[in-house]
Amino acid sequence: MPDAAHAAVPGDLVELGRINGAYGVKGWVKVQPHSAQADVLRKASSWWLTRLVPEKARGVVASAPQEYKVVQARPQGASVVAQLAGITDRDQAEALRGLAVQVSRSQFPAAADDEYYWVDLIGCAFYTNAEGEPARVGVVEEVFDNGAHAILRVVLQRAPAPGGEPEPRRDAKGRPLEMLVPFVGAHILAVDLSARRIDSNWPTEL
């Protein structure tokens, strides 16, 4: 059961994973994290669980996030397993299968120097000096892990007209052009989260 069904829902919730089933018989749940940064899931004092709506579903409304206190959580291979307050048997844990796990951004531990939470990189303008002076070439749409390091998926953009907004560059079929950039020191020169900007030396040739 939720710890507080009527608790005010934070406005800064970040989805960090999905519950993919029960773990054991004592009410523990197993979570598949969305990224390698699962330490936030393990350290957060509360999770907010939401049942999302499939993209093709019609007439279905997503459930409101409900808060569950985390009694304990630990890594289990590539997953995270956790005991939530009020969930005491396998049937209750299985009932949570498929729910999105969200955590308030305010609960994230402070990142170490030269380390960044992936969620903070999404939406940053991406610049490169590969052709000389730094130029904005796109925006970070997604961050994922390739097993060795993080990868930025950058949607390429055209330079905006005066007073306008950047627009995606597209191929002959109208699909947005993208590039994948290793998030490593050899190519990422600077990250300024306050300015929402990432500078690199990555070439933009496709």
Curated annotation (Swiss-Prot):
<comment type="function">
    <text>An accessory protein needed during the final step in the assembly of 30S ribosomal subunit, possibly for assembly of the head region. Essential for efficient processing of 16S rRNA. May be needed both before and after RbfA during the maturation of 16S rRNA. It has affinity for free ribosomal 30S subunits but not for 70S ribosomes.</text>
</comment>
<protein>
    <recommendedName>
        <fullName>Ribosome maturation factor RimM</fullName>
    </recommendedName>
</protein>
<dbReference type="GO" id="GO:0005840">
    <property type="term" value="C:ribosome"/>
</dbReference>
<dbReference type="InterPro" id="IPR002676">
    <property type="entry name" value="RimM_N"/>
</dbReference>
<dbReference type="GO" id="GO:0006364">
    <property type="term" value="P:rRNA processing"/>
</dbReference>
<dbReference type="InterPro" id="IPR011961">
    <property type="entry name" value="RimM"/>
</dbReference>
<dbReference type="Pfam" id="PF24986">
    <property type="entry name" value="PRC_RimM"/>
</dbReference>
<dbReference type="InterPro" id="IPR056792">
    <property type="entry name" value="PRC_RimM"/>
</dbReference>
<dbReference type="GO" id="GO:0043022">
    <property type="term" value="F:ribosome binding"/>
</dbReference>
<dbReference type="GO" id="GO:0005737">
    <property type="term" value="C:cytoplasm"/>
</dbReference>
<comment type="similarity">
    <text>Belongs to the RimM family.</text>
</comment>
<dbReference type="Pfam" id="PF01782">
    <property type="entry name" value="RimM"/>
</dbReference>
<keyword id="KW-0698">rRNA processing</keyword>
<dbReference type="GO" id="GO:0042274">
    <property type="term" value="P:ribosomal small subunit biogenesis"/>
</dbReference>
<dbReference type="InterPro" id="IPR036976">
    <property type="entry name" value="RimM_N_sf"/>
</dbReference>
<feature type="domain" description="PRC barrel">
    <location>
        <begin position="113"/>
        <end position="206"/>
    </location>
</feature>
<comment type="subunit">
    <text>Binds ribosomal protein uS19.</text>
</comment>
<dbReference type="InterPro" id="IPR011033">
    <property type="entry name" value="PRC_barrel-like_sf"/>
</dbReference>
<keyword id="KW-0690">Ribosome biogenesis</keyword>
<keyword id="KW-0143">Chaperone</keyword>
<dbReference type="InterPro" id="IPR009000">
    <property type="entry name" value="Transl_B-barrel_sf"/>
</dbReference>
<keyword id="KW-0963">Cytoplasm</keyword>
